[in-house]
Swiss-Prot record:
Taxonomy of the source species: Eukaryota, Metazoa, Chordata, Craniata, Vertebrata
Biased composition (Basic and acidic residues): 32-52, 194-205, 220-249, 302-314, 868-877
Modified residues (N6-acetyllysine): 175
InterPro entries registered for this protein in UniProt: Zn532-like, Znf-C2H2_11, Znf_C2H2_sf, Znf_C2H2_type
Keywords: Acetylation, DNA-binding, Isopeptide bond, Metal-binding, Nucleus, Phosphoprotein, Repeat, Transcription, Transcription regulation, Ubl conjugation, Zinc, Zinc-finger
Family the entry assigns: Belongs to the krueppel C2H2-type zinc-finger protein family.
PROSITE patterns given in the database record: ZINC_FINGER_C2H2_1, ZINC_FINGER_C2H2_2
Identification of the protein by name: Zinc finger protein 532
Pfam families assigned: zf-C2H2_11, zf-C2H2_6, zf-C2H2_ZNF592
Regions of compositional bias (Acidic residues) in chain numbering: 136-151, 852-867
Gene that encodes the chain: Znf532
Mapped zinc finger ranges (C2H2-type): 615-634, 751-775, 784-807, 814-840, 938-961, 999-1021
Length: 1036
């Protein structure tokens, strides 16, 4: 039955709806936890708009009772004494929204608009928050709470009455009536004698002691305003015929909360409590009229108006359904609704000061006369029929090992906070009130959070403290400073803000076993949803197994959590934090030694050239005059730094800070910031800090680990005892002296270098010059050295190019004595020999006689080597000149067009049309005319092909036959008298043409003014003509 379906239920239905349920289905609670929490946020926001009171996001007071049922709300909550408000409040903190709802309902009841049942339906839904566990302060899945043992309910009940209303709740009031028999005739309630006056007295003492906690926090000004408001509200309610101490007190709380701001929530709550305690006597006097007026209140009006409240608080229906279901089996479980559902929203709860809900059974009977009789029966702890476990086994599932979180500011606040005594008093009060109860009823929620006295924490570092629970059980808790929580989420940071209220948060895993502090902590159970029976049994096993098994059970319990509800917050342990701090200290530490600046002005006679600022270390700023000193600087051993570079994916070992930073600089130059892990710092023994140099010679010290990489091949001179090590040009070196034991063997008459004519001042300088020069010029000699400089090349073509570019073509030239043009020269003797063989028909020319010996700087051996080289690898120019052989034998296969004009008598002419071949040119010219279809067509005299235009024929001759211009063609019979002379170039014609022939197009016979215009014109004929032009120009 939903709230929308409620028509006019009987009064018994409403009373039964608010019976205390024994158990809430954990699955249902898990499914609806998120939505319920969102609906709470919306309700809180609605209350804020009406009453201008901040929602429950602010940090509440440090000690407020947990699981307070809405005993101080108006008559609907107390109708049957069974409050589902265990659901309503979490960890003993009454939410601001709940107080606001009191204020709203109180105001409405003054006006007579809203019946008391509206408060009955609204308060359970609104009371599911605590001032500390607001939706804004913590995220939905990151809550911490402790379900306190049910043994402390007696003290909690009395404490609730003072904190919230200043008067005893109706349920306790019924107990008092049953014990004292004072008001039983007025209320008509039959009582059961399961409590005695000692318990009542103890409750009263607990109330008074607990209220004394807040004495130092009283605010006088707020107290006076609260007193005035309470008096006005009491008077108005008495006039309306509804005098209710619960209404007046809730109105006072609402008035207090409506006048406060988020920053003053704590002080306003304390002031409200103080004012309510001052009104205790007036509230007690109003109890009996409240009960009588509630019984006499008309039912239909309450029921008709109640759906309005139900619309505002959809959570109430879930509570009613759960309570009705639980009322069918009132003796099943001593657990209350809040013990399961309170895990939804509360991040913290006081262990030492807040007892649990009493296990009672209230039986409501409506007599025929219309009177209501209720019987309150104390239910002893029994085995839970739903889960089959005792209350001590009802602990929720284990969270993954959660260490205590303390922010640094919170630690300072804890150390300097004055109210130590009130917190200790609160803990003592809880312990005394539950002294007679069995310690088996202690239940621990998934993430237990205890509010410890300030004296429990003395330092901000990691330590183990003893925590005494309310059942006289002492456990060890590990407190770790906030330095290890640098990567925590915003929820953890907000939790640390809540800690600043003079409390210390200790998770339940630390309570279970203080030695389990893993490196990486996954706060898997911060969702605080009711857990299943499997996880509950695992916690029970954890508490009884050895430490090794505890760790495994914790991992299994964490794995059983719903994956979508797990908050993946990784907390860096203190060990990792110390490593990171050490690494940062190494990288950011200031060098205590001042920056070293060398003397960069050597004597003038030393002949040493130094950089402007020396060889400077980019990491520490030290500068050195010698590059060897800089290499030794990077090789020094001061500390062993072993680190894993994530970019290089390898373990690296550095022996000083500069080498590590230099490696990081290499990554930075590539645009990547160096990331490293597994840092290990080890001191270097004093005997290993200085690496002894080698015992060879003074110069051999240059063979250091860094400098050796740039050194060339060592050269050993046979007459010297030690090896002379050639160093880089930038590194000054001392020569190996003396050069010879006997000075008479030294063929030196002055301090002048015979190679470069440089004069030196002393023998060491000259020796250094020679050794240094040998180092620079001691490169590997290639096959073709240049005689003009110290370079060498692997091929003769590279050498020729080098001579042509660097030495302006200074080279021995060969001129042909048979050619009339003296400008025809050759750069190689082989080319001259081939020229004479091809052009002049001399088989064995004497090149030595023909060569120009003027300025000859080469020898015959080089020329012979070049001839052999050229014979193996012919040059591109030689390839073009080879087909011009005059006495070359004819080709065996004449199946392709002739690519070059062959000037020989053995030429075979082939008809391209029919394939006729002959060596007689006249016979060939007599054959080809028969293939000419038209007398006006242009026929090629070389192959017999016909073309329609002279340009096409000229193009064919130029490309295929390499002829510069077409031959005269006979139109009649194709045979001319001078047909044999056409293939021979005329020397007279070539001379006549002169310079104009160079600018004439060989394809279309056009003449151009410049060579550039001709080259541009050749592009119109295509690449084939351009290549032909280049080849023809190369032949010259």
């Amino acid at each position: 039955m939903t709230m929308g379906d409620m028509k006019t239920p009987d009064f018994d239905d409403l009373l039964a709806a608010f019976d205390i349920p024994d158990m809430v289905d954990p699955k249902a609670a898990i499914e609806s936890g998120h939505d319920d929490h969102e609906s709470h946020i919306k309700q809180n926001a609605h209350v804020d708009d009406d009453s201008h009171t901040p929602s429950s996001s602010d940090v509440g007071v440090s000690v407020i009772v947990k699981n307070v049922r809405n005993i101080d709300s108006s008559e609907g909550v107390e109708k049957d004494g069974h409050n589902p408000t265990g659901n309503g409040l979490h960890n003993g903190f009454l939410t601001a929204s709940s107080l606001d709802s009191y204020g709203k309902d109180g105001a409405k009841s003054l006006k007579g608009d809203t019946p008391a049942s509206e408060v009955t339906l609204k308060d359970p839904a609104f009371s599911q928050f605590s001032p500390i566990s607001s939706a804004e302060e913590f995220e939905d899945d990151e809550k911490i709470e402790v379900d306190d043992p049910p043994d402390k309910e007696e003290a909690r009940a009395g404490f609730r009455s003072n904190v919230l209303t200043g008067s005893a709740p109706q349920q306790d009031f019924d107990k008092l009536k049953a014990l004292g028999g004072e008001n039983s005739s007025k209320t008509g309630v039959s009582t059961s004698g399961h409590t005695d006056k000692n318990k009542v007295k103890r409750e009263a003492e607990s109330n008074s002691i607990t209220l004394s906690v807040y004495e130092p926090f009283k605010v006088r000004k707020a107290e006076d305003k609260l007193k005035e408001n309470s008096e006005k509200m009491l008077e108005s309610r008495v006039l309306d015929g509804k005098p209710s101490s619960e209404k007046s007190d809730s109105g006072i709380a609402a008035a207090a909360s409506s006048k406060t701001k988020p920053s003053s929530k704590l002080s306003s709550c304390i002031a409200a409590i103080a004012a309510l305690s001052a009104k205790k006597a007036a509230s007690d006097s109003c109890k009996e009229p409240v009960a009588n007026s509630r019984e006499a209140s008309p039912l239909p009006k309450e029921v008709n108006d109640s759906p309005k409240a139900a619309d505002k608080s959809p959570e109430s229906q879930n509570l009613i359904d759960g309570t009705k279901k639980a009322s069918l089996k009132p003796s099943d479980s001593p657990r209350s609704v809040s013990s399961e559902n309170s895990s939804k929203g509360s991040p913290s709860s006081p262990v030492g000061s807040t007892p649990a809900i009493p296990k009672v059974r209230i039986k409501t009977i409506k007599t025929s006369s219309g009177e209501i009789k209720r019987t309150v029966t104390r239910v002893l702890p029994e085995v839970d029929l739903d889960s089959g476990k005792k209350p001590s086994e009802q602990a929720a599932s284990v969270m993954a090992s959660v260490t205590s979180l303390l922010s640094s500011s919170a630690s300072a606040t804890v150390l300097s906070s004055p109210p130590r005594a009130p917190l200790q008093t609160a803990m003592v009060t809880s312990a005394v009130s539950s002294a007679e109860l069995t310690p088996k009823q202690v239940t621990i929620k998934p993430v237990a959070t205890a509010f410890l006295p300030v004296s429990a924490v003395k330092t901000a570092g990691s330590q183990v403290i003893n925590l005494k629970l309310a059942n006289n059980t002492t456990v060890k808790a590990t407190v770790i400073s906030a330095a290890s929580v640098q990567s925590a989420s915003s929820a953890i940071i907000k939790a640390a803000n809540a800690i600043q209220q003079q409390t210390v948060v200790v998770p339940a895993s630390s309570l279970a076993n203080a030695k389990l502090v893993p490196k990486t902590v996954h706060l898997a159970n911060l969702n605080l949803l009711p857990q299943g029976a499997q996880a509950t049994s695992e916690l029970r096993q954890v508490l009884t197994k050895p430490q090794q098994q505890i760790k495994q059970a914790i991992i299994n319990a964490a794995a059983s959590q719903p994956p979508k509800k797990v908050s993946r917050v990784q907390v860096v342990s203190s060990l990792q934090s110390s490593v990171v701090e050490a690494f940062n200290k190494v990288l950011s530490s200031v060098n205590p030694v001042p920056v070293y600046t060398p003397n960069l002005s050597p004597p003038a006679n030393a002949g040493i050239t130094l950089p402007m600022r020396g060889y400077k270390c980019l990491e520490c700023g030290d500068a050195f005059a010698l590059e060897k000193s800089l290499s030794q600087h990077y090789d020094r051993r001061s500390v062993r730094i072993e680190v894993t570079c994530n970019h290089c994916t390898k373990n690296l070992v550095f022996y000083n800070k500069c080498s590590l930073l230099s490696h990081a600089r290499g990554h930075k130059e590539k645009g990547v910031v160096m990331q490293c892990s597994h840092l290990i710092l080890k001191p270097v023994p004093a005997d290993q800090m200085i690496v002894p140099p080698s015992s060879n010679t003074a110069a051999s010290t240059l063979q250091s680990s860094v400098g050796a990489a740039t050194h060339t091949v060592p050269k050993v001179q046979p007459g010297i005892a030690g090896a002379v090590i050639s160093a880089p040009a930038s590194t000054p070196m001392s020569p190996a002296m003396p050069l010879d034991e006997d000075p008479s063997k030294l063929c030196r008459h002055s301090l002048k270098c015979l190679e470069c004519n440089e004069v030196f001042q002393d023998e060491p300088s000259l020796a250094t010059h020679f050794q240094h020069a040998a180092d620079t010029s001691g490169q590997q000699m290639k096959k073709h050295p240049c005689r003009q400089c110290d370079k060498s090349f692997s091929s003769s073509h590279s050498l020729c190019r080098h001579n042509r570019i660097k030495h302006k073509g200074i080279r021995k030239v060969y001129a042909c004595s048979h050619c009339p043009d003296s400008r025809r020269t050759f750069t190689k003797r082989l080319m001259l020999e081939r020229h004479i063989q091809l052009m002049h028909g001399i088989k064995d020319p004497d090149v030595k006689e023909l060569s120009d010996d003027a300025g000859d700087v080469t020898n015959d051996e080089e020329e012979e080597a070049e001839i052999k080289e050229d014979a193996k690898v012919p040059s591109p120019k030689r390839k073009l000149e080879e087909p011009v052989l005059e006495f070359r034998p004819p080709r065996g296969a004449i199946t392709q067009p002739l690519k070059k004009l062959k000037i020989n008598v053995f030429k075979v002419h082939k008809c391209a049309v029919c394939g006729f071949t002959t060596e007689n040119l006249l016979q060939f010219h007599e054959h080809i005319p028969q293939h000419r279809s038209d007398g006006s067509s242009h026929q090629c005299r070389e192959c017999g092909l016909c073309y329609t235009s002279h340009g096409s024929l000229a193009r064919h001759l130029f490309i295929v036959h390499k002829l510069k211009e077409p031959q005269p063609v006979s139109k009649q019979n194709g045979a001319g008298e001078d047909s044999q002379q056409e293939n021979k170039p005329s020397p007279e014609d070539e001379a006549a043409e002169g310079a104009a022939s160079d600018r004439k197009c060989k394809v279309c016979a056009k003449t151009f003014e410049t060579e550039a215009a001709l080259n541009t014109h050749m592009r119109t004929h295509g690449m084939a003509f351009i290549k032909s032009k280049r080849m023809s120009s190369a032949e010259k």
